[in-house]
């Protein structure tokens, strides 16, 4: 049986690793979290989120104590926002 001390040491190791590598977050559209932003700030997240069609842009936040990630606001799931922007730029695209 694994002792409590071994579990505790493993838990602390995972937290320490997450704090060091917390800027490397992979996209997760379900949670609205896209990419790590440790050291980049809100301007970086706003650009990233707009590339992912977030109507409200984005900000660099700390969704949990061991990770800094871009939080995108109102991601457009059906691409309507993107298509409307294209139609404004290229009126000939209208159906």
From Swiss-Prot:
Signal peptide bounds: 1-22
Disulfide bonds: 37-60, 45-70, 49-72
Cellular component GO terms, alphabetical: extracellular region
Localization in the cell: Secreted
Primary site of residence: secreted
GO molecular function: ion channel inhibitor activity; potassium channel regulator activity; sodium channel regulator activity; toxin activity
Keyword terms of this UniProt record: Disulfide bond, G-protein coupled receptor impairing toxin, Ion channel impairing toxin, Neurotoxin, Potassium channel impairing toxin, Secreted, Signal, Toxin, Voltage-gated potassium channel impairing toxin, Voltage-gated sodium channel impairing toxin
LCN-type CS-alpha/beta domain ranges (all copies): 23-91
GO biological process terms, semicolon-separated: defense response; positive regulation of lipid catabolic process
Tissue expression per record: Expressed by the venom gland.
InterPro entries, A to Z: LCN-type_CS_alpha_beta_dom, Scorpion_toxin-like_sf
Domain notes: Has the structural arrangement of an alpha-helix connected to antiparallel beta-sheets by disulfide bonds (CS-alpha/beta).
Protein's job: The homodimer inhibits HMG-CoA reductase (HMGCR) (32% of inhibition produced by 0.6 uM), a glycoprotein involved in the control of cholesterol biosynthesis. The inhibitory effects of bumarsin are seen at much lower concentrations (0.6 uM) than that for statins such as atorvastatin (5 mM) and simvastatin (10 uM). In addition to inhibition of HMG-CoA reductase, this protein lowers cholesterol levels by inducing steroid hormone synthesis via StAR, and by increasing reverse cholesterol transport mediated by the induction of ABCA1 and APOA1.
Family (UniProt): Belongs to the long (3 C-C) scorpion toxin superfamily.
Subunit relationships: Homodimer; disulfide-linked or monomer (edited version) or heterodimer of an alpha chain (AC P84810) and this beta chain (non-edited version).
Name of the molecule in the record: Lipolysis-activating peptide 1-beta chain
């Amino acid at each position: 049986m694994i002792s409590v001390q071994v579990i505790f040491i493993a838990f602390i190791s995972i937290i320490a690793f997450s704090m060091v590598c917390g800027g490397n977050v992979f996209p997760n559209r379900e949670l609205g979290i896209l990419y790590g932003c440790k050291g980049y700030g809100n301007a970086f997240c706003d650009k990233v989120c707009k590339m992912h069609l977030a109507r409200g842009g984005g900000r660099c936040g700390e969704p949990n104590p061991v990770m800094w990630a871009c939080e995108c606001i109102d991601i457009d799931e059906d691409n309507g926002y993107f298509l409307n922007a294209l139609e404004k730029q290229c009126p000939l695209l209208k159906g």
